[in-house]
A protein has these predicted regions:
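Gram-negative bacterial Sec-dependent N-terminal signal peptides
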Residues: 1-17
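Amphipathic alpha-helical coiled-coil scaffold segments and their short linker/junction regions
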Residues: 22-31, 80-86, 123, 218-276, ...
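Start-of-domain marker
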Residues: 23-64
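Sec/SRP-type N-terminal targeting helices
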Residues: 35-39, 52, 109-137, 187, ...
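Periplasmic alpha-helical coiled-coil/stalk elements that build and connect Gram-negative outer-membrane
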Residues: 46, 133-246, 251-253, 344-347, ...
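Small/polar, glycine/serine/threonine/aspartate-rich low-complexity segments that form flexible
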Residues: 62-105, 275-312
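Acidic, low-complexity, intrinsically disordered peripheral segments
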Residues: 67-69, 225, 399-427
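A short glycine-centered flexible hinge/capping loop motif at secondary-structure junctions
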Residues: 179-183, 376-382
Length: 427
């Protein structure tokens, strides 16, 4: 969809601290909220590494010192070997009451199906965190854009109010001359004074609203603006896919892998390799009367097949429900976003037309006000009627500024939905 840029014909608002919209977007990267999102992304990546680390062997050294109440064999021997040792001079089946062992133990999974499923689960969760970080960035950018457009609306409304105030003051001076000359009653000035007071009240209320928007931007950027910054739509919106769904889609894929992992844990066998080797020392062998030592070790390939575990069956049911919830959540969010897209696009078309109509209305109100100022000065129009023309021009300008602000806010909403980085779109 091509979005037309509204040409702003009103008085340009100057930022006293010379901050640009790009600088505001850049400042977002340094804020704690987005840094937290970055840490969440890193935690997701490390979570996958943690699961994958289970594929690696574990290596442990061990040692022991054991004293028995009766002589105990140093290591297991088959009967034939034990018989030969007993008959060989200078040899003996090693028995002792005190035995020391030093060795190494290695364990390594050869086949554990659930580890593969869990690794894929963590991969999708890491991607979900990545997309979530990007989405939060786009939301923050859209918030800044919306707040700045609101501030721009109020700034230009202030310009119009001050212009109206100046216009009324000029008329006040003309009426004062007529009152002093006796051509108009003194109450004519009271009506003008009342109008000036109303304008001052409106100006004060707008300044309060401005402070709220300035604070909103400051919370996100740590930059306190004095006025709104200029904005121009540099590139058109890219409508590739609904980016706002990506974190949920990756979370759904993670839920599917989570269910598969629980099923694998319940039904799939596990194969593991275990290796052990130790040096065993016997103090004061029973027969030889001296210390001896022998090496002893084994390797083992073991298989474990789950037959029945009620808790795992319950876990499967819970994971199925969670998966269904995630699916329904995506369907719900997708329907809502599609409705939002359709509504925003229709609004943008209407706002384009409103911008043209309000600009034309401003021209007409300016011409009418010129005639009204002359008429009231010459006494051919009451002060009430003249002030209505001042209000008419003020209202026409306000409606135009409001249309411009609403269009910026609508664009900001679409950029979040479609995942467009405003830093490259708005200059």
């Amino acid at each position: 969809m091509k979005i037309k840029t509204i040409a702003l014909s009103f008085v340009a608002v100057v930022s006293l601290n010379a901050t640009t919209i790009t600088e505001l977007f850049d400042a977002l990267d340094q804020q704690p909220s987005l840094q937290i999102d970055e840490l969440n992304k890193q935690m997701g990546q490390i979570g996958k590494k943690k699961v994958d680390s289970n594929y690696y062997p574990t290596l442990n050294l061990f040692g022991s010192y054991t004293h028995y109440n009766s002589p105990t064999n140093l290591l297991p021997l088959d009967p034939i070997t034990a018989g030969k040792l007993a008959q060989t001079p200078g040899k003996s089946v090693p028995f002792a009451q005190t035995i020391q062992k030093v060795g190494v133990l290695v364990n390594m999974p050869l086949y554990v199906k659930e580890l593969g499923e869990l690794s894929q689960k963590m991969k999708h969760l890491a991607k979900s965190a990545k997309y979530k970080k990007m989405l939060n960035l786009y939301k923050s950018q859209a918030t800044i854009l919306g707040a700045n457009s609101g501030l721009e609306y109020l700034d230009n409304l202030l310009v119009t109010l001050n212009s109206t105030k100046k216009s009324v003051q000029n008329t006040q001076n003309d009426i004062k001359i007529s009152v002093d000359n006796g051509r108009m009653p003194g109450i004519a000035l009271d009506k003008i004074d009342q109008k000036l007071n109303e304008l001052d009240i409106n100006i004060n209320n707008i300044n309060i609203q401005r402070l709220n928007l300035i604070a909103k931007i400051q919370k996100l950027t740590n930059i306190k603006l004095k006025h709104s910054v200029k904005m121009n739509l540099d590139t058109k919106l890219q409508e590739n896919s609904i980016f706002a769904l990506k974190p949920l889609e990756e979370k759904l894929l993670a839920s599917k892998k989570d269910l598969s992992a629980v099923k694998s844990k319940r039904y799939s066998p596990k194969v593991a390799l275990n290796v052990m080797y130790s040096e065993n020392y016997a103090q004061e062998d029973v027969k030889l009367g001296k210390s001896v030592h022998e090496g002893y070790g084994y390797y083992q390939i073991g298989i474990s097949i789950p037959l029945y575990d009620k808790s795992k069956s319950v876990d499967i049911e819970l994971k199925k429900i969670q998966l269904l919830k995630d699916q329904k959540n995506i369907e719900k969010t997708k329907d809502e976003l599609k409705a939002d897209i359709q509504s925003i696009k229709e609004q943008l078309k209407l706002l384009d037309r409103s911008a043209l109509l309000t600009k034309e209305n401003i021209k007409k109100q300016k011409n009418l006000l010129k005639f009204a100022k002359v008429a009231v000065k010459e006494g051919r129009m009451t002060q009430e009627d003249y002030l209505r023309y001042e209000d008419g021009l003020l209202s026409a300008n306000a409606k135009y500024y409001q249309v411009v602000s609403k269009k910026w806010q609508s664009i900001a909403k679409l950029t979040v939905i479609y995942g467009n980085n405003l830093k490259g779109m708005i200059k």
